A protein has these predicted regions:
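N-terminal intrinsically disordered/low-complexity leader segments
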Residues: 1-20, 158, 215-234
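Generic hydrophobic, amphipathic alpha-helix propensity
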Residues: 17-29, 47, 72-80
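Helix-turn-helix
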Residues: 24, 35-67, 71
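Alpha-helical DNA-contacting segments of helix-turn-helix folds
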Residues: 66-79, 83, 120, 134-135, ...
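Hydrophobic alpha-helical connector segments
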Residues: 85-115, 171, 197
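Amphipathic C-terminal alpha-helical segment
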Residues: 109, 148, 168-190, 204-219
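Amphipathic alpha-helical segments used for helix-helix packing
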Residues: 112-130, 147, 180-184
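Amphipathic alpha-helical packing segments from all-alpha helical-bundle domains
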Residues: 129-155, 165-180, 198, 202
Length: 234
């Protein structure tokens, strides 16, 4: 190609190719992870080879594998935030129909994006501390957003803030468990998929029904007795 032609090429074409290479590296890391490797066990050379680029191209996008992992967390969770935002909007008052539709929609999304959710589930307890912290931060974000929504609707609007946050945490961890169960499914197991989905729906119903009957004054946990203090037992 003529050098002058290259110089006249619109800059957006170069940017587009750069974005394509970056995405190829992210997809390569997800694929290698699915083949059984955690992020900490995958080398950047393996990622570059899987993406079809030379290793030096990796450094044009990421300093190291930790930075690639952080980009993956951002990329996956950015898409997930929109799904959860829509679910929160429809389930603000936790009607039964909204719980069912939200769970079924989430199940479909997980099964359509298994590699991404396998990455989040695996790296939540992975060896890379920066990535592990990023996943934990996203989980706290989802829980905090849900708590903010719940606070504006009864019965949660009358509950102490800590209790609302506890309900949100229960919901988020139920969804995390649902995700892990779905990822263990093999292909062609519709009955098991239905069982997992139905159980999650029932668990969320129980959480919201229980929260509606919650009395904060009855749920107080007394502090531990000071060392040497009488236990009150005979």
């Amino acid at each position: 190609m003529n050098v002058r032609t290259e110089a006249r090429r619109p800059p957006n074409l170069r940017d587009e190719r750069k974005l394509q290479t970056r995405q190829a590296l992210l997809e390569a890391a997800l694929e290698l992870g699915r083949q059984g490797g955690s992020l900490a066990s995958i080398s950047l050379r393996e990622v570059a080879r899987e993406a079809g680029v030379v290793p030096t191209a990796f450094y044009r996008h990421f300093r190291d594998m930790d930075e690639l992992g952080l980009a993956l967390v951002d990329d996956v969770c950015l898409r997930l935030r929109q799904i959860i935002r829509e679910a929160r909007a429809s389930a603000r008052n936790a009607p039964d129909a909204a719980i069912q539709s939200s769970v079924r929609g989430f199940v479909a999304y997980v099964l359509a994006n298994e590699r991404a959710f396998e990455f989040l589930t695996r790296e939540r307890f992975g060896a890379s501390r920066p990535v592990r912290q990023a996943v934990a931060r996203e989980i706290r974000y989802f829980s905090g957003e849900l708590a903010s929504d719940l606070r504006v609707a009864p019965p949660f609007s009358a509950m102490p803030g800590d209790d609302v946050e506890m309900v949100a945490d229960l919901v988020v961890h139920t969804v995390l468990n649902l995700t892990a169960d779905l990822l263990e499914l093999g292909e062609g197991q519709p009955v098991r998929e239905h069982e997992i989905t139905a159980r999650a729906i029932k668990q969320l119903r129980l959480i919201f029904l229980g929260a509606a009957q919650w009395r904060p004054e009855r749920g107080a946990v007394p502090p531990p007795a000071a060392p040497g203090a009488p236990s009150g037992r005979p």
